[in-house]
Curated annotation (Swiss-Prot):
Native source species: Bos taurus
Main function: Membrane-cytoskeleton-associated protein with F-actin-binding activity that induces F-actin bundles formation and stabilization. Its F-actin-bundling activity is reversibly regulated upon its phosphorylation by the cAMP-dependent protein kinase A (PKA). Binds to the erythrocyte membrane glucose transporter-1 SLC2A1/GLUT1, and hence stabilizes and attaches the spectrin-actin network to the erythrocytic plasma membrane. Plays a role in maintaining the functional integrity of PKA-activated erythrocyte shape and the membrane mechanical properties.
Interaction with RASGRF2 as annotated region, ranges: 225-309
Biased composition regions of type Low complexity, renumbered to the chain: 11-29
Keywords, sorted A to Z: Actin capping, Actin-binding, Cell membrane, Cell projection, Cytoplasm, Cytoskeleton, Disulfide bond, Membrane, Phosphoprotein, Repeat, Tumor suppressor
Signal sequence segment: none
GO molecular function terms noted in the UniProt entry: actin binding; actin filament binding; signaling receptor binding; spectrin binding
Chief location category: cytoplasm
Localization annotation: Cytoplasm; Cytoplasm, Cytosol; Cytoplasm, Perinuclear region; Cytoplasm, Cytoskeleton
Protein name as annotated: Dematin
Highest taxon listed in the record's lineage: Eukaryota
């Protein structure tokens, strides 16, 4: 009877639950004993941390299970009192049926209650997973990455089983999945992104390329010297063969054939400039050399009459034929006169407002002043055709209106 009246011993920070049998494991009835005081679960949060309290788990994370060390007499006398003592960081699994049978038998009361009264901690299985540590390579955190494991495993084999995956892994090591060009200077590698190559590396590369270019130029000059010697020898042979031919016609034919067989070798740096601006400039000056003096200045300024505005032809009245006339063919004139423009007296070219006057055939209605002779032109406009061509378009039109030529 002393054993029945004896209260169960608990640790200083133990949690005991007075639960109803109908509701096993209810968190609302959990209490904790500390310094001979019974504390509810809500009061545990107000306890300062410097108290000597063992680890008390939250009720929603605790495993509630009946203790298996009580006897039949305890079940009769105390039907609703159950205890559960928690040792630090330890939980107990549910007992097996054999243990239940031994604990319920009356002969095992002292044996079952003896370890409980002693208060020794119980060993239990952990509620979380531990990785296997039997093998040294079982820890996944100490293993190399997967692609390195595959590279090590397939490194000895001549052909990989997954060439596409290996190619992707290999290309992922380079920025933009492009390996660097071995001919280019290496870039500076940082933690963020590869920087441009250093100036020292660029300078050395530039010096190497410059030296290689100098060597190539020297080789080219040597080849030119060799070719010059070959040309001299070939010319000497030609002279010997020409001296053997007696007839003049045979000499001419043989000379032409030999000139065709000569290798045409020219350096690009010795060739003249062939840019469009250069050619158009030279073409403009060559064309204007055969023209009169008053038309040469405007043509050299415009360089070509094909791209001049509609009034540019009026600036050069001396363009009588040639390229200037061909440039006006695409401006709507039906039948341009390729030959020299005809000269008419001033009275035949006058335009009046009274009625539509008949102009001579083949006359340009927009440039009637070109059909005037030099004497009539100076008499009507009081200036030379060269001075008239230097005036602005609106000024020329005003003068032509006054002279009834517009």
């Amino acid at each position: 009877m002393e054993r029945l009246q004896k209260q169960p011993l608990t640790s200083p920070g133990s949690v005991s639950s007075s639960r109803d049998s109908s509701v096993p494991g209810s968190p609302s009835s959990i209490v904790a004993k500390m310094d001979n005081q019974v504390l509810g679960y809500k009061d545990l949060a107000a306890i300062p941390k410097d108290k000597a309290i063992l680890d008390i788990e939250r009720p929603d994370l605790m495993i509630y299970e009946p203790h298996f060390t009580y006897s039949l007499l305890e079940h009769v006398e105390l039907p609703r009192s159950r205890e559960r003592s928690l040792s630090p960081k330890s939980t107990s699994p549910p007992p097996s049926p054999e243990v239940w049978a031994e604990s319920r038998s009356p002969g095992t009361i002292s044996q079952a209650s003896a370890p409980r009264t002693a208060g020794t901690p119980r060993t239990s299985l952990p509620h979380f997973h531990h990785p296997e540590t039997t093998r040294p390579d079982s820890n996944i955190y100490k293993k190399p990455p997967i692609y390195k494991q595959r590279a090590e495993s397939t490194g000895g084999s001549p052909q990989s089983k997954h060439p596409i995956e290996d190619l992707i892994i290999e290309s992922s090591k380079f920025p933009a999945a492009q390996p660097p060009d071995p001919n280019q200077p290496a870039k500076i590698e940082t933690d963020y992104w590869p920087c441009p190559p250093s100036l020292a590396v660029v300078e050395t590369e530039w010096r190497k390329r410059k030296a290689s270019r100098r060597g190539a130029e020297e080789e080219e000059e040597e080849e030119d010297d060799d070719s010059g010697e070959e040309m001299k020898a070939l010319r000497e042979r030609q002279r010997e063969e020409l001296s053997k031919v007696t007839s003049n016609l045979g000499k001419m034919i043989l000379k032409e054939e030999m000139e065709k067989s000569l290798p045409i070798r020219r350096k690009t740096r010795s060739l003249p400039d062939r840019t469009p601006f250069h050619t158009s400039l030279h073409a403009g000056t060559s064309k204007s050399s055969s023209l009169p003096a008053y038309g040469r200045t405007t043509l050299s300024r415009l360089q070509s009459t094909d791209f001049s505005p509609s009034g540019s032809e009026a600036e050069s009245p001396g363009l009588q034929n040639g390229e200037g006339q061909r440039g006006r063919m695409d401006r709507g004139n039906s039948l341009p006169c390729v030959l020299e423009q005809k000269i008419y007296p001033y009275e035949m070219l006058v335009v009046t407002n009274r009625g539509r006057t008949k102009l001579p055939p083949g006359v340009d209605r927009m440039r009637l002043e070109r059909h005037l002779s030099a004497e009539d032109f100076s008499r009507v406009f009081s200036m030379s055709p060269e001075e008239f061509g230097k005036l602005a378009l609106w000024k020329r039109n005003e003068l032509k209106k006054k002279a009834s030529l517009f």
